[in-house]
From Swiss-Prot:
Protein name: Maltose permease
Topology feature Cytoplasmic, residues: 1-11, 75-78, 127-137, 184-213, 263-272, 319-330, 383-394
InterPro entries: MFS_assoc_dom, MFS_dom, MFS_trans_sf
Any single Pfam family the record assigns to this protein: MFS_1_like
A molecular-function term among this protein's GO annotations: cytidine transmembrane transporter activity
Cellular component, GO, one term: plasma membrane
Subcellular location: Cell membrane
Species per Swiss-Prot/TrEMBL record: Geobacillus stearothermophilus (Bacillus stearothermophilus)
Keywords on record: Cell membrane, Membrane, Symport, Transmembrane, Transmembrane helix, Transport
Amino acid sequence: MGAAFKWGAAARKTVFPLFYFLIFFAFGALFPLLSVYLQEEARLSGAAIGWIMSLPPIVTMAAQPLWGTAADYTRKPVGLLLAALVLAALFGVMYALAGSYRLFVVLTVLLSAMQSAIVPLSDSLALRHVHEQGGNYGAIRLWGSLGFAMAVLAVGWLSDHIAFAVIFYAFSLALLTAAALATRLPRYPMGAPGALTRQDVRGLLASRPFRLLLVATFLLFGPILANNSYFGLLIHELGGTLTGIGLAFLFAAGSEAPFMKAADRLIGRFGMVRLLLLAALISAARWLAYAADPPLWFVYMTTVVQGCSVGLAIPTALQYARRLAPERVQSTAVALYSAVGNGLGAWFCTLVGGYLLERWQIGAVYLFFSICTIVGVLVLLLLAKRERTAGEEK
């Protein structure tokens, strides 16, 4: 028992934080600069970039529920995570060699199918670890924000001074290192394989609070994740350099860390829905400011508010989705939550953003983001009202 506790403490202090740092370092190395790469190096049109950047959310929407169901069915989430990491790294290297629009499309689909498993499986493992050993999920997840922030700065500088293709090699190297570390992630006893039934999944989807959370996730996280595709173009259009893009992402992602660490304490004090409302209102204000064609210095200054919006929204929404689900379908619930926000919402916002960018300017993209987020605030208000009603009935 003592040995198990020591291993749990060691995993919480070193293995999980380093693992999150590596996987988000990989994402930060590739995705913020990918749209700029497709524009500057591949010479693709705005509509073509919009289509390619909308593919990962489409694939995520289809693949993530399958990964989550597979994890609940096989009871082997670490093995599935390891396979996804290695294959995503392989497709990342192949992406660097692509030279045509069709090849970009094929590799984007393959890469996205593997990459879509990484975060929900990692989150399920981390949440299970915190449940078993104690601790703070936000304190683990903040290392992902730090990894993302360091990657966009370091890889942005390297792509400016060496070669743009370095974004793909940095992505793959970080994922392979994370795969090696994944073999040390703790494995906890789980139910027998095959215990998950269709009735379990139907019961989850029949929950109205869970459905409302999915709608709010679509409207809140769709713009947040689509921003990763268009934020570099916004700064580039305002006169920023690749290193400047890296600095902006550094400020934005780095500001998330303290809020993620404080998320559990704030949840206990204010409640999950109130924190999500605060995050949504801050995001809406930020998108409206970007739609107004602000000066570059203003964009750099306002990136730090991402900590109060995204830094609170990610751990709060994830834990809320898990709380609403029965234990036997929690991996599926996390995967569905991720598929709707990271998949459907991001796809919709990225695709519409591409057409708005082609027809008008980047400001129209951020005006659309603000409208989506404001509608998301209304859904969260409905969810808050339902929670109050349920509390009064009890």
